[in-house]
Amino acid sequence: MNKEIETLLSEQLSSWETAQNNYAALKRVRIKDVKVNGCLYRIQFNPARIVSSAAKVDSKSIQERKCFLCPANLPPMQKGIPFGEHYQILVNPFPISPKHLTVPELQHVEQRILHRFSDMLDLATYAEDYIIFYNGPQCGASAPDHLHFQAGNKGFLPIEQESKEKRGEKVITCKDATLWALNDYPRATLLIEAGSKETAIMLFNTVYQAMPSTSGEDEPMMNVLVWKEQKNWIVCIFPRNKHRPSCYTAEGDTNILISLSLIHI
């Protein structure tokens, strides 16, 4: 257990009313587990998450608002702890898990993973009780203009267990790292299990370079999960081809407000 993170959570939930109220509301959230084609889906009715799910992420809206992850724009009550030389760890005031963190870069730089994946692995080591996740700029990130990771406590995502049970085709093995394709339709999940940081990065870069980039985008559309399991790194990569489903913009009875970030996948 990372005592610095636990202390931050405790202090923020006792002193910051917004976070305090939303974490209390999370305990009243309705949850239902259903299985579809053998895959477990955890349905959560969490009205407080509308702030993120309905966030406007078009270029015009982003340019017109102050970046809520820049240090100068944080609420006065929001405190953080440093991580490495470029990040700070914050309590997410709109939680989806019992312990939910946001880890933004101190500088205002775009949401891009390729040259920051190493930092993501380091964060998984530092916050060993957490799963680290990255949402691409057009894959659920509510701040696509500011580099950040998020973290949720282990045990709240079904993929943790399914990553062990649903390994299908072994794609490639390189030294102490293996790339698997999971049998978890309708998702398309690639899983890397690596015994060293170097081989995890090598296989991730291989997958990244093989993925197609959408026209006009600098980065292939993807969501990424990382956590430590004993001495190994587990990396789940979820390729994407669309930001929001057609039902998001549909009208009338066909409208369903679903905005898929990694947590929802």
Where do the language-model regions lie?
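Active-site acidic/histidine clusters and adjacent loop/turn architecture
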Residues: 63, 82-91, 97, 101-114
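Histidine-centered divalent-metal-coordination microenvironment in nucleic-acid enzymes
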Residues: 100, 137-161
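Intrinsically disordered, low-complexity linker/loop segments enriched in Gly/Pro
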Residues: 106-128, 133-136
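A short glycine-rich, hydrophobically flanked beta-strand micro-motif that places a catalytic Asp/Glu
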Residues: 130-143, 217-228
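Helical (often loop-to-helix) elements that flank the catalytic cores of nucleotide-handling enzymes
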Residues: 152-176
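Conserved small/polar residues in nucleotide/adenosyl-binding loops
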Residues: 263-265
